[in-house]
Amino acid sequence: GKDIIMRAHVVSQKLNREQTKEYYTNTKIEFPVDYLDVLKDFTLNEPVDLYAPEFAYGAGIFSSRKDLMEEKLGTNQGILFQMGEAYKCYRSIEDFTPLTAEQKAVLEALPSPAYKQLLTVLNDKLLKKIELNKQKTGYKINEIGKVTNEELFSTIISKFRGHVLLVDFWATWCGPCRMANKAMIPMKEELKDEDILYLYITGETSPKGTWENMIPDIHGEHFRVTNDQWAYLMSTFKIGGVPTYFVIDAEGNTTFKQTGFPGTDTMKKQLMKALKK
């Protein structure tokens, strides 16, 4: 509905990042108060809905507007609401955040024990992974210290001057970022004897706990900047999304920049090109 209309308009007008941000901030599309009354005419809260592959995804989306769904459906009970609560717990685990006592109580209260059983298994696996992460090496969390926004990026890369750098602007919630990180593991192993360092920069939209539990599997130098610093980097370097990659040669020159993972072959080619300069 609303999102599709706005996205289509943004794409058709080919707006740049700043215009897009201003558009989404200032454009208000008013819908009639009864616009979503049609929801009560759909079968959204029956066990038969579980046969639809998209139902779990939809329940997850609806869980963020539980108040609206209660109003339109006239109830807060049923499979849709159960799945919504379970989905929120699942997303927590997916974000490397173990279930809280409150979340466990929510699962305990659900009519079907299946939710608790399945999510307890996933939660236990996560807890074991977190313990194993404490023993892992190959990654380092770096503190930036107090610097101006103008000095931020130069401060980050200065201690690594003289090496070829692959700088990855990413986020823990970014699926393509996470897939790319896994895809590059064999490449990094292949190039381990080359003079290449990997720098990962993320912002506060990556929850600190999630970030700390995710990076042990991402070998390299890690930085987590503030929202203000992140916004400055995005604006200064005209970064429109994540992941965005910079290849920087030993002299500090940016030899390659791309938003979106270009694939390991291209990445390796660009790194080797920078090494030979």
Model-derived regions, located:
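Conserved segment of the thioredoxin-like fold in thiol-based oxidoreductases
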Residues: 189-230, 235, 239-242
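Short pre-active-site segment immediately N-terminal to redox-active cysteine/selenocysteine motifs
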Residues: 163-165, 169-173, 241
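Thiol/disulfide oxidoreductase modules built on the thioredoxin-like
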Residues: 228-272
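Extracytoplasmic/secreted envelope proteins and their assembly/folding machinery
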Residues: 150, 154, 185-188, 208, ...
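Conserved redox-active cysteine motifs that mediate thiol-disulfide chemistry
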Residues: 169-186
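Oxidative protein folding and maturation machinery
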Residues: 1-161
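Conserved helix-turn-beta segment immediately C-terminal to the redox Cys motif
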Residues: 163-164, 181-201, 269, 273-274
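Hydrophobic, well-ordered secondary-structure segments
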Residues: 136-139, 150-156, 163, 177, ...
